[in-house]
C-alpha cells in the first residue's frame, strides 16, 4: 500500500508534474497550430478539395481522441470485470504451453493468472475472491490503445503517399494535354499546320483502336481480360489512350468547349476523392474488430489476410484496363454497323453500373495494406521480432513483400488508371467546375433555398448539368 501511495500523483514532485504537463500541452498546441496554418495555406491557394480532406483528417483525429478518452476513463471499470477462468482460456494469439493449458484450475492457479493478467500495482483480490479472473488487464488495454493510434497514423501516411505519388504520375501526362490544346485552330494558321496536327491526331486514334480492337484475337473476351491483367504492370496509360478518352469526355460533356483542361479536371477530382479515402469508415473499423477476433494462434490469419489487398488491387486494375478495351471494341462494332463511330462513356462499363465502387475498393485496399504494415510495426516494437504473434520468417517476408508491391502498384498504376477511366461514366464529377464557379453555384443554390424558390428549380441546380461548357470552367488558368 505504501508503494502504491508513493507512486500516485499525491507523492510525485510538483516539478515533474508541471514539466510533463508543459511538454504534452506544448506538443499538442504545435500540432494544432500546424494544421491550422496548413489549412490557411490551402485556402489561400484555393485548394478547396485538399482543405476539405484536411478537415476530414481533423475529424479522424477527434475520433481518435474520443477512443483514447473512452479507454482511459473506462479503464478502472473494465479491469474490475470478472469472468470465469474457462471463458478466457481459449482463442489466444499465441499458443499456451501444453502443461499450462491442461493444468487443473485450482484456486492457487486462478490467483496466479489474475496476477499475471494485471499490471504491477493492481490488486487481484476483487476477482480472486470470487474464484474468477479479470476480463482484461490494464497492460492489454494500454497496448490496444497504442495499436489503434498506430493504425490511424499509418493509414493517413499511406493514403497521403499514394495520392502524392499517383498525382505525380498523372502530372507526367500534362504534356499530352498541352500537345492537344496547342493544335492549330486559330485563324491565320497554315493549311499545312492543320493537316499535320490532324494527321497526328488520326495516328493516335488509329493506334488506340489497333491496340485494343485490331485483329480477331483482340476481340476475344478471354484474351482481352488476360491482356488487361498484364497491361496494368507496364504502360498502364499510353498517349493514344489518354487522347481517345479525353476526346470521349469532351464530346459527351463539353462538346462546345474543346479546349477544356481535362488534365486539371482529373487532378481536381483526385483531390476531392482524397477526402473520402483518408477517412476510416465504420465498416473498416468493423474489419479491424473481425481480424482481432480471428487472430488466433495457429490459424495464420495474418498471413492469409495479406493476400486480400493484392488480389483486390489486381482485380481493380484489370477491370479498369478492360473498360478501355471495351470502349475501343464498342466503337469497332459501331463501324461494322455503319453507325457513328464515337466513344460513348457509360456507367454500364463498371461493376453494378456504379463507378464509385472502384473508389470504395481502393479505399479498402489502402486501409487493409496500412493495417498490415501497422500491425507488423506495432508487434515489432511492442513484443519484439521473436514474438509468437509475428509468426515464422517464412510467413513474415511474403507479407512485407506483398505490402510494398501493393503500395507501389496502387500509386503508379491503379490510382492513375482510376483517375482517367472513371471519367468514362455517364455523369461527370463535381471537380469539373473550378473553385470559383463551384462556390458561385453553391451560393446561388443557397440563396434560392432561402428565398423559398420552387423545389423543382432548386433540384435542377443541384443535379449535374449536361452542358458544363456554358460555364467558365477554365477561369483558374493564369
Swiss-Prot record:
Transmembrane residue ranges: 11-31, 61-81, 146-166, 277-297, 298-318, 361-381, 401-421
Extracellular-side positions: 1-10, 82-145, 382-400
Membrane topology, from the record: Multi-pass membrane protein
Keyword hit for Iron: no
Residue ranges, annotated region (Disordered): 449-478
Disulphide-bonded residues: none
GO molecular function: calmodulin binding
GO biological process, one term: defense response
Localization, UniProt: Membrane
Regions of this protein lying in the Cytoplasmic compartment: 32-60, 167-276, 319-360, 422-478
InterPro entries according to UniProt: Mlo
Chain intervals for the UniProt region annotation (Calmodulin-binding): 435-456
Basic and acidic residues bias locations: 449-462
This protein's UniProt keywords: Calmodulin-binding, Membrane, Pathogenesis-related protein, Plant defense, Transmembrane, Transmembrane helix
Function description: May be involved in modulation of pathogen defense and leaf cell death. Activity seems to be regulated by Ca(2+)-dependent calmodulin binding and seems not to require heterotrimeric G proteins.
Record-given protein name: MLO-like protein 13
Origin species: Arabidopsis thaliana
The organism's taxonomic lineage, starting at the top: Eukaryota, Viridiplantae, Streptophyta, Embryophyta, Tracheophyta
Amino acid at each position: 500500500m505504501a508503494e502504491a501511495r508513493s507512486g500516485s500523483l499525491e507523492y510525485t514532485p510538483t516539478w515533474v508534474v508541471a514539466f510533463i504537463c508543459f511538454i504534452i500541452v506544448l506538443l499538442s498546441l504545435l500540432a494544432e497550430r500546424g494544421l491550422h496554418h496548413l489549412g490557411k495555406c490551402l485556402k489561400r491557394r484555393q485548394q478547396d478539395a485538399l482543405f476539405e480532406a484536411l478537415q476530414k483528417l481533423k475529424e479522424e483525429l477527434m475520433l481518435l481522441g474520443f477512443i483514447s478518452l473512452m479507454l482511459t476513463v473506462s479503464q478502472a471499470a473494465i479491469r474490475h470485470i470478472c469472468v470465469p477462468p474457462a471463458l478466457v482460456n481459449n482463442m489466444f494469439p499465441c499458443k499456451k504451453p501444453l502443461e499450462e493449458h491442461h493444468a487443473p484450475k485450482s484456486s492457487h492457479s486462478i490467483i496466479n493468472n489474475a496476477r499475471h493478467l494485471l499490471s504491477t500495482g493492481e490488486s487481484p483480490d476483487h476477482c480472486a475472491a470470487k474464484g474468477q479472473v479479470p476480463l482484461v488487464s490494464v497492460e492489454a488495454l494500454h497496448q490496444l490503445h497504442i495499436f489503434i493510434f498506430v493504425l490511424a497514423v499509418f493509414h493517413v501516411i499511406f493514403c497521403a503517399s499514394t495520392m502524392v505519388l499517383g498525382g505525380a504520375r498523372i502530372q507526367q501526362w500534362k504534356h499530352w494535354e498541352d500537345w492537344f490544346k496547342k493544335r492549330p485552330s486559330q485563324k491565320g494558321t497554315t493549311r499545312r499546320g492543320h493537316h499535320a496536327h490532324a494527321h497526328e491526331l488520326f495516328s493516335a486514334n488509329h493506334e488506340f483502336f489497333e491496340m485494343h480492337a485490331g485483329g480477331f484475337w483482340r476481340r476475344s473476351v478471354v484474351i482481352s481480360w488476360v491482356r488487361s491483367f498484364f497491361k496494368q504492370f507496364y504502360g498502364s496509360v499510353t498517349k493514344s489512350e489518354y487522347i481517345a478518352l479525353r476526346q470521349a469526355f469532351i464530346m459527351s460533356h463539353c462538346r462546345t468547349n474543346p479546349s477544356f483542361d481535362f488534365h486539371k479536371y482529373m487532378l481536381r477530382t483526385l483531390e476531392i476523392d482524397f477526402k473520402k479515402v483518408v477517412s476510416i469508415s465504420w465498416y473498416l473499423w468493423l474489419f479491424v474488430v473481425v481480424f482481432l477476433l480471428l487472430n488466433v494462434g495457429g490459424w495464420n490469419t495474418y498471413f492469409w489476410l495479406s493476400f486480400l489487398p493484392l488480389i483486390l488491387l489486381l482485380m481493380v486494375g484489370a477491370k479498369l484496363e478492360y473498360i478501355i478495351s471495351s470502349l475501343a471494341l464498342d466503337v469497332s462494332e459501331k463501324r461494322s454497323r455503319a453507325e457513328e463511330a464515337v466513344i460513348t462513356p457509360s456507367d454500364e462499363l463498371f461493376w453494378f453500373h456504379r463507378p464509385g465502387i472502384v473508389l470504395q475498393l481502393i479505399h479498402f485496399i489502402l486501409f487493409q495494406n496500412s493495417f498490415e504494415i501497422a500491425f507488423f510495426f506495432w508487434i515489432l516494437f511492442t513484443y519484439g521480432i521473436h514474438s509468437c504473434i509475428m509468426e515464422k520468417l517464412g510467413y513474415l517476408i511474403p507479407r512485407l513483400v506483398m505490402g510494398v508491391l501493393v503500395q507501389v502498384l496502387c500509386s503508379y498504376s491503379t490510382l492513375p488508371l482510376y483517375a482517367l477511366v472513371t471519367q468514362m461514366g455517364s455523369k461527370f464529377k463535381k471537380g469539373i467546375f473550378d473553385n470559383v464557379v463551384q462556390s458561385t453555384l453553391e451560393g446561388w443554390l443557397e440563396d434560392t433555398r432561402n428565398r423559398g424558390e420552387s423545389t423543382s428549380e432548386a433540384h435542377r441546380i443541384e443535379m449535374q448539368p449536361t452542358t458544363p461548357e456554358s460555364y467558365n470552367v477554365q477561369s483558374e488558368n493564369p
